[in-house]
From Swiss-Prot:
This is Ribonuclease HII. InterPro entries: RNase_HII (IPR022898), RNase_HII/HIII (IPR001352), RNase_HII/HIII_dom (IPR024567), RNaseH-like_sf (IPR012337), RNaseH_sf (IPR036397). Manganese or magnesium. Binds 1 divalent metal ion per monomer in the absence of substrate. May bind a second metal ion after substrate binding. GO terms for molecular function: manganese ion binding; RNA binding; RNA-DNA hybrid ribonuclease activity. Its EC number is 3.1.26.4. The gene is rnhB. One of its GO terms (cellular component) is cytoplasm. Its cofactor is Mn(2+); Mg(2+). Endonuclease that specifically degrades the RNA of RNA-DNA hybrids. Belongs to the RNase HII family.
Length: 196
């Protein structure tokens, strides 16, 4: 996978999972890859099967120079808005790295406020290995967390849709109302609450 941007020093790739769902946290990951220990098969997490993502997540944890995963809670999403909560989760992930990054590449078109140079790369999770690695860690950690929430709130089917807006999720919202882990600032949830 080509590194399209000329990075500075130790580069961390940053990506998130969970901006679009109606429930659960938004999760971000930051990864500094080891050029001496390349990882074959890195790609945008959405283009990989669950089995492949899980296998790659293990390899990333073993081979990366450093990695960290952080989240912004449903309460933070509702208080700040999803964009600001996503930036907060990204900042937390970078701050949690065991090795200090010297620059950052982030998937998308906005960078979080960091104390290192940062460049946003549109569709970076399909272009830059460290962002792809962050995409995979963020997605696998968020999915695991949604399975925990499914055990607490089984009526909503989080194990199937991970909180994303699906017909089944809308039907569950209509039947059961919003759970404590639903994002009240999101239109479909707010509309459901207004009907109660």
């Amino acid at each position: 996978m080509p590194e399209l941007i000329v990075p500075v020093g130790l580069v961390c790739g940053i990506d998130e999972a969970g901006r679009g769902p109606l429930a659960g946290p938004v999760v971000a990951a930051a990864v500094i890859l080891d050029p001496e220990r390349p990882i074959v098969g890195l790609n945008d997490s959405k283009k990989l099967s669950e089995k492949k993502r899980d296998a790659l997540a293990e390899i990333i944890r073993e081979r990366a120079l450093a990695w960290a995963v952080a989240e912004a809670t449903v309460e933070e999403i509702d208080r700040l808005n999803i964009l600001q909560a996503t930036m907060l989760a990204m900042q937390r992930a970078v701050a949690a790295l065991q090795v200090k990054a010297e620059s950052a590449l982030v998937d998308g078109n906005r960078c979080p406020k960091l104390d290192i140079p940062c460049e946003a790369v549109v569709k970076g999770d399909g272009k830059i290995a460290s962002i792809a690695a962050a995409s995979i860690l963020a997605k696998t950690v968020r999915d695991a967390g949604m399975l925990v929430l499914h055990a607490q709130y089984p009526h909503y089917g989080f194990d199937r849709h991970m909180g994303y807006p699906t017909a089944a999720h809308f039907a569950a919202l209509e039947a059961h109302g919003a759970s404590p882990v639903h994002r009240r600032s999101f239109g479909p949830v707010a509309r459901q609450l207004s009907l109660l």
